[in-house]
């Protein structure tokens, strides 16, 4: 079982990137052995300028992490997405997370042609991202079937919220690595053969998340994990997890970029979420503590 952390992008109150907090987050994930995904929806990738994204990725690569590092490629303008892929091709990353184009709602042929274009441009393997709640369309099963043997098609991150659809992806492309993209569904998707979890909660609890990923049917882990999810996921991601990280002093500020706002999260949820994870069974080895 593998764990990748969908990493937040820390900001100062003036909106600039807090690179010191980012380094702290990445170093902790590296110490535990969790891979990282940068500039996805949790990383507010669509809210960063091209120069900011370039600076962030180069900064992360300069840290020489020992764990896999994946980079998000969200966008709707193909020329810009291809330009971003070409920039990242020359960097020592592990691969891309390629999101179904948002807002435009492509049908089957358009989606296949889009992913063909971005996969053909990539020199690193890619995980395609099924996220219909944000993209307004799913990663179609026939798209997966058409691209199943593309040499750069490594896997799928499934945040569709359906175990049945997850199983359909697996039956169509059994050789593709399937990642659960929702913290709340890890136990069910692990039982269906998931390769791993791409987690948001692991930003704040990297060791606990790793234990749960390795032991998805352990009832004590599952109960505490689900209780924490109940408090964190009361609003749009990454608002809740940034509030948690700031509370735990993992990042300096819970700053987000508009249209996201910390005002859309009840800060009274922070303490119960943190307290619920304090009941986690004592880890065999502890690498660090945020607070």
Curated annotation (Swiss-Prot):
It is found in: Cytoplasm. Gene3D superfamilies: Aldolase class I (3.20.20.70). InterPro entries: Aldolase_TIM, DapA, DapA-like, Schiff_base-form_aldolases_AS, Schiff_base-form_aldolases_CS. Its main location: cytoplasm. Catalyzes the condensation of (S)-aspartate-beta-semialdehyde [(S)-ASA] and pyruvate to 4-hydroxy-tetrahydrodipicolinate (HTPA). The keyword Transmembrane helix does not apply. It comes from Chlamydia pneumoniae. The lineage of its organism: Bacteria, Pseudomonadati, Chlamydiota, Chlamydiia, Chlamydiales. GO terms for molecular function: 4-hydroxy-tetrahydrodipicolinate synthase activity. The keyword Lyase applies. It catalyses: L-aspartate 4-semialdehyde + pyruvate = (2S,4S)-4-hydroxy-2,3,4,5-tetrahydrodipicolinate + H2O + H(+). Pyruvate binds at residues 42, 198. Homotetramer; dimer of dimers. This is 4-hydroxy-tetrahydrodipicolinate synthase. The active site is at 129 (proton donor/acceptor), 157 (schiff-base intermediate with substrate).
